[in-house]
Amino acid sequence: MPNLSRLLEAYAQRVSALSRLQTYIGTDAGRRVMDGLVRRGDGENLHAVIWYSDLRDSTALAAAMPRDLYLGALNQYFDSVAGAVIEHGGEVLKFIGDAVLAIFPIDYPQEPQPAACMTALAAVGDAFKRMSEINKQRRADGESELSFGVALHRGNITYGNVGTVRRLDFTVIGPAVNEASRIEGLCKSLRTPVLISKRFADSVATNLRSLGHHELAGVEEPQEIFALPKP
C-alpha cells in the first residue's frame, strides 16, 4: 500500500504540473515539455489553419484607461478569442501583445475541404458572439466597446522549439504564418473584421466574398482576399 500511495501521489503531482504548464504555454507544448521534448531545434512540419487576430485601437485604449481596467479589457478580449479557439479544438500558441496566434492542425492536407477549416470558421463565429455579449455588459457599465480583426489562412508550418539555451519557446514559423499576420493587417483598411486567404477560401463550401487582390508585405504577388458573406 505505501508503494501505491507514492505512485498515486507522483501521478497527482504530474497531473498538477501538466495543468499549470498547459495554462501558460498551451496544451500541446505543455505535454511536450512534460515528456522531455525540450531540446532547442526540436520540431516538426505541419499543415494547418493559421489564425491571427488583433485587438483594434489597443494603443488608444491603453492611453485612455487606468492600468487595471485596460488589463481587464485585454482579458475580456482574450476570453472571447482564445476561449473560442480552445473550445473548438484549436491550439493557442502565443499572445503577442494584444494579438493571438493559433493553429488548427489539418491531418489530411490532400482533402479538398478539411474539417479543420470549417472548425476554424465556427470558432470565428463563436469569438464574435462572445465579444458581443461582453460588449453588452461593457455598454451597461459605461465602458467603451471592444473590437478585433482576425485572419484565417492555411499552409505548411514548422512547429518547433526555438530560442536560446536558457530561454526556449514553442512556436510556429514559416511564410504562411507571416502571411496570416499580413492579411490580418488589412482588416482595418478594408473595414472588414474577418479576412480569409484564397487558399483557405478554396477549402470551404461557404460562399465567401472576394475583396480583390491586395499587396502583402514580403509576398511577391498580390493575393486575393476574401470576406464572410454579408448577413
Where are these regions (language model features)?
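Regulatory cytosolic signal-relay segments
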Residues: M1-N45
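Catalytic NTP-binding/metal-coordinating core of nucleotidyl cyclase/transferase enzymes
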Residues: A12-R14, R39-A122
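A structural signal for short, well-ordered beta-strand segments
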Residues: I50, V100, F148-R154, I225
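Catalytic strand-loop-helix junctions within cyclic-nucleotide turnover domains
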Residues: I103-A115, V150-F170, C187-L190
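Alpha-helical scaffold within the catalytic cores of cyclic-nucleotide enzymes
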Residues: N75-G89, I106, Q110-V150, P175-L186
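Helical mechanochemical/support elements of P-loop NTPase systems and associated helical scaffolds
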Residues: I25, A29, Y70, Y77, ...
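Cytosolic regulatory/linker segments at or just downstream of nucleotide-handling modules
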Residues: I157, A180, L186-P231
